């Protein structure tokens, strides 16, 4: 997931000339490191308590890194969480859209029952800031519907 997100960010960098896409790529690389400690919990199952546990374990690990890396990563995580900068918004759109693409690639037997409806609307709010991402989301939705209809 992180690798494909990183490639995604690199390949669309021309679409966002005013954004620091190197920062977006760094966000893509590090965003799921906390899951190394907690496991991958699906977004629709993750609770605030899960998020807090993951954050605490991640911060404990970040504190073991050399200060320059720890500080940069903590800064990136804060920016991603606040989701106010163009880079953080681009990162979150990529994260959400890549997850949908993974679902469209995967066999329907791997989908949980709620994903059949969720995948039709998921990420709409994450892409609304960008015409480019909104159009891409619509193309991914079309692929989702085709996949469901074929089954």
Locations of regions flagged by a protein language model:
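Active-site helical microenvironments for divalent-metal-assisted chemistry
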Residues: 1-151
């Amino acid at each position: 997931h992180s690798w494909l997100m990183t490639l995604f960010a690199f390949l669309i960098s021309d679409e966002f000339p005013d954004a620091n896409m190197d920062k977006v790529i760094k966000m893509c690389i590090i965003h799921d490191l906390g899951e190394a400690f907690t496991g991958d919990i699906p977004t629709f199952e993750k609770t605030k308590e899960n998020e807090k546990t993951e954050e605490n374990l991640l911060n404990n690990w970040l504190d073991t890194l050399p200060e320059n890396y720890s500080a940069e990563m903590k800064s990136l995580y804060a920016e991603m969480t606040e989701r106010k900068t163009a880079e953080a918004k681009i990162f979150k759109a990529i994260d959400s859209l890549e997850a949908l693409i993974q679902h469209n690639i995967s066999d329907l037997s791997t989908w949980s029952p709620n994903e059949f409806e969720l995948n039709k609307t998921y990420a709409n709010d994450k892409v609304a800031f960008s015409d480019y991402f909104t159009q891409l989301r619509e193309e991914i939705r079309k692929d989702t519907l085709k996949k469901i209809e074929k089954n």
